C-alpha cells in the first residue's frame, strides 16, 4: 500500500479560492464579514452594477459610453494610483453621476500586508477618491483589516462576480453568468481593466439589455 500524504490547506487560501472562483459567494463567507454589503434588498427588483480596478483609458471611457447609452448609473471602485494617472477619467465618472468607491491605492491584497500597511494604502487612495465606500481587492481581508474598514467605511462586496477578468471566459460566458445568477438586490461586479474590456464590448451592453428586459432597475449606493 502506497503512502498517502496529507496536506494542510490554510484558512486564508481557502478564502482566497472561494472569493475568486465562484460567481456567487457562499453563505459562510458572507457570515464571516457580516457588516459588509453583499446583496441589497431581496424584495426590490433592482441591481447594483459595480466596476473594479480602473480608471484606465483603454476601458473606462467605453464603459461610460455604454452606461450613458442605456441611462444607467453604476459604482466604480477605483485604484488610487490610476486616478493619479488619469484624473480626467475620474472626473468624467463623477460628472456623469456615478458613485466612487475605494479599491486601495495599489490594488493590494489584505492577506499580504499588515494592518498598518493596508490602512495606509487605503487612506492614500482616499486622498484622491473622497468616498465612504470601499471594496478590498479580490475580497481579501484579514479580520483586523475588516474591523478597521468597518469603522471608517461601508464595505461593499458582491452578490455576483461575472468573472469577466478570466482568460478562460468568453463574452458569452460573462453574459451567461449574469443571466444565471442575477437576482433582486444583486451587487454585480465587472472590471474596467485590460483583462476584461474585450469581453465587455459585447457582454456589457448585452447584460444591461437583458437585465432591463427582465424588469430590473439600476441603482447606486446612497
Residues of each region from the PLM?
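A short, conserved beta-to-alpha structural element at the edge of catalytic cores
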Residues: 69-96
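CE4/NodB-like, metal-dependent polysaccharide N-deacetylase domain
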Residues: 64-73, 98-99, 105-108, 115-143, ...
